[in-house]
Amino acid sequence: MSVKRRCVVAPGDGIGPEITEAVLRILDAAGAPLEYDLIELGEAVYRQGVTSGVPPEAWDKIRASGCLLKGPVTTPQGQGFKSVNVTIRKTLNLFANVRPCKAYNPFIASPHPGMNLVIIRENEEDLYAGIEHRQTHEVTQVLKLVSRPGCEKIVRFAFEYARAFGRRRVTCMTKDNIMKLTDGLFHRVFDEVAAQYPDIASDHMIIDIGAARLAASPETFDVIVTLNLYGDILSDIAAQLTGSIGLAASANIGEQAAMFEAVHGSAPDIAGRGVANPSGLLIAATQMLVHLGFGDIAQTVKNAWLCTIEDGIHTPDIFRVGLSAEEVGTAAFADAVIARLGKTPKQLAPVQYQRGVRDFPEPELDEAVSEPADREGTPEDISVNPESLKLVRDFLLKAHKQQPATPVRVQTSSPPRSNRQLVGVDVFVYWDQDGRCADTLAGWLQSAAPAGAHLSLITNRGVKVYPEGLPETFCTDHWRCRFRFDRPAEDYGRCLELLGSLAAAGVDIIKTENLYTYDGEPGFTLGQGE
């Protein structure tokens, strides 16, 4: 008998408790060797005054287990509340979000029956750092953070995932034609890492045309890797194209822990009616089983689910007259899956988690994994084990031997340190004089600045308004004022001298950003029109 593995389960909000109960019934019926620690997350916790939605005692259980199966939670709208999902992902360093999206044609209606792609999303950085400020009466700001180690970890993960699971192409999507430093860094790292994987094709798309092509022809994509915000949006679009977002699962993988969840939300409008589709959370649970080393149980459960779909036993979100055989609720759907445990689908490709990616002989595992596999019939939703981050092939070896994962530290390369010089500072100010004339503001700032600090630029919402601004440009009360030093500063004292002079003149300083060059190359972007 397998040793039971303890995992943490959070039923969540809305339809969460209903679908969680259904999923746990299926896992128990399949003989999953699991013990559950139930925790409360989300709405009820927010009402207790915990703004993160995660109570302290829940952290202890999650960290001790290293594995969380989470139902959907509701984050209250408005200020003062943090997303539970984002909080858990960032706190536990769950840097990789893996969302497979596959059509189950002809049993679930989809406009794209051939789609079978995986979206791998950076999970910790980008705008989801959630650092926002209201800086003036009219202007708010969000900080977009992108690091080289963060980029390299997720890009390397994507290529190793592709190599391990027989995927042939990795597509990077960014908006680096506009965000040249942040998205530009992600693109550059992608190109650097891609060169190390000559067996995997690679390409890059600007996110807007990439999203359009994904919506129009998802079957042309294989693996997409992208930044946090873009990946969140793209994966929901792709999930809906499969026929229902209720089918989509998400694995959040880190070096010490993992979280598995459905992609959909808490759907409070149908909560308590017993009609919610538990498929997304069930597929997430099979990902969790593979992650924990119970691939045989995961295979039994997923194949039973495929048989249920194949037999036309469908919840209302995927039921179609003439296509489905019977419309059932949440509990009846779970009963149907349980009744089919031990069976394999006849038309849909059965999954083979015990054998890993393909049904090859055990002794040939290592060699087989290193070769691209035929896409046809490739299992689309095997979770990537944290140990695989040393390289994903290690996961397959572990999964075959049915051993639980042991965490490892992901190694990233460190670029050589550049000659970093402080050459100026962007001073952001609040100024709301009549007319909001940039030339007037510039004259005031220049008269207040000390010798050696030259005002070179003023922008408003990123558009140059001084020198030679245009009268048609609309201006708010928020101004970026770029000062350049006549020579590189030896320390921050030059900035303090400038800021002291401006403050003494009555300038309302909101924030500053230092301007650095790295081996002579600017570490900052030009203003629009500069």
Predicted regions and their residues:
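Flexible, glycine/charged-enriched surface loops at secondary-structure junctions
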Residues: 35-38, 165-174, 197-205, 294-302, ...
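N-terminal glycine-rich phosphate/adenylate-binding segment common to multiple enzyme folds
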Residues: 46-141, 229-231
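Glycine-rich phosphate/diphosphate-binding loop of Rossmann-like nucleotide-binding domains
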Residues: 8-31, 136-207
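Glycine-rich phosphate/nucleotide-binding loop
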Residues: 45-47, 215-300, 307-312
